[in-house]
């Protein structure tokens, strides 16, 4: 009987230790919303101090910024530092500005990759709005915090340009990187379904809980059904887009970015912008986890 008690006690002790270990792992797992709020607070603090060096430390060494201005991606931490130095220079329209950022959605998509999306507003010292828009970013978790892998932030204001003053969308890059062809197919299908005004097939390019953060829609759209139901196509509009950069992140995740243009065939007006998206590879398909595209 004594042996039985000893065995029971040992078993209970092992179960208790196992449960404690599981609890500790859960407790130590990073919370996406908390990490995102902390990241945005650090970003805002550095911006409001006009501290380019501090801001650049929020990015990984190989991070990419896709923003409304300039009209090309900013690649790598050193280039990102220079971009912030330019933003805070006294020649910049954003000199001595301050920024307000809010988080709409934050998610963990793997053990070390996170996404976030929300809105931003940049104001002058008199609180006049200089620029406002939406953001949808991808982050890498390291040393207890997240850093930008991809910033894709775009202003709401629309700038239309005559056709002769717009750069023609060139062909997409070629790459032998893993799963690149699946991304290329996804982008081609996106263009086709928009131009065919096919909301059903367009929505199926997204994961079931996919996020759409685009300048043509009010707010940030969550979920495939909402993406489909919110599509409004205008007659005479023709979309084109390309891929200018791609990176496979492991764990069936990839980021890609590029340029887009939309032509009004009735007036000749062309609207241009950039996009930076997060994809999930499943079999032969690349599904959009998050689309983040906006105006130049």
Model-assigned labels for residue ranges:
Residues 1-4:
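Positively charged n-region of N-terminal signal peptides that target proteins for export
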Residues 7-14:
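Bacterial N-terminal signal peptides
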Residues 17-53, 57, 157-200, 204:
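Short, low-complexity N-terminal intrinsically disordered segments enriched in polar/charged residues
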Residues 43, 54-56, 63, 76, ...:
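Hydrophobic pocket/interface hotspot
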Residues 59, 69, 118-120, 137, ...:
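A mature extracytoplasmic/lumenal domain signature
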Residues 64-75, 90-93, 211-221, 234:
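A short gly/proline-enriched turn/hairpin at secondary-structure junctions
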Residues 79-125, 228-272:
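Surface-exposed, charged secondary-structure patches
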Residues 130-165, 272-296:
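Short beta-strand edge/turn micro-motifs at domain boundaries
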């Amino acid at each position: 009987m004594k042996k039985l008690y000893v065995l029971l006690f040992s078993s209970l002790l092992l179960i208790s230790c196992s449960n404690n270990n599981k609890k500790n792992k859960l407790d130590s797992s990073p919370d996406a919303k908390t990490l995102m709020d902390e990241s945005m607070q650090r970003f805002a603090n550095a911006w409001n101090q006009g501290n380019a060096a501090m801001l650049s430390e929020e990015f990984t060494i190989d991070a990419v910024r896709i923003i409304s201005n300039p009209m090309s991606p900013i690649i790598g931490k050193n280039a990102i530092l220079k971009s912030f130095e330019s933003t805070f220079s006294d020649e910049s329209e954003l000199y001595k500005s301050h920024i307000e950022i809010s988080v709409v959605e934050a998610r963990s998509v793997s053990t070390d990759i996170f996404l976030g999306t929300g809105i931003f507003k940049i104001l002058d010292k008199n609180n006049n709005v200089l620029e406002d828009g939406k953001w949808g970013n991808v982050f890498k978790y390291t040393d207890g915090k997240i850093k930008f892998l991809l910033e894709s932030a775009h202003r709401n204001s629309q700038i239309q340009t005559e056709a002769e003053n717009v750069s023609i969308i060139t062909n997409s890059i070629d790459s032998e990187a893993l799963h690149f062809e699946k991304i290329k197919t996804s982008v081609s299908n996106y263009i086709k379904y928009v131009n065919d005004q096919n909301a059903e097939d367009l929505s199926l390019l997204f994961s079931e809980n996919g996020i759409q953060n685009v300048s043509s829609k009010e707010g940030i759209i969550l979920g495939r059904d909402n993406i489909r139901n919110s599509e409004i196509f205008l007659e005479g509009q023709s979309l084109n887009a390309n891929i200018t950069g791609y990176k496979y992140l492991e764990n069936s995740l990839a980021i890609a970015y590029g340029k887009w243009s939309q032509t009004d065939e009735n007036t000749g007006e062309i609207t241009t912008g950039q996009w930076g998206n997060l994809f999930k590879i499943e079999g032969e398909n690349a599904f959009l986890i998050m689309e983040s595209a906006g105006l130049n």
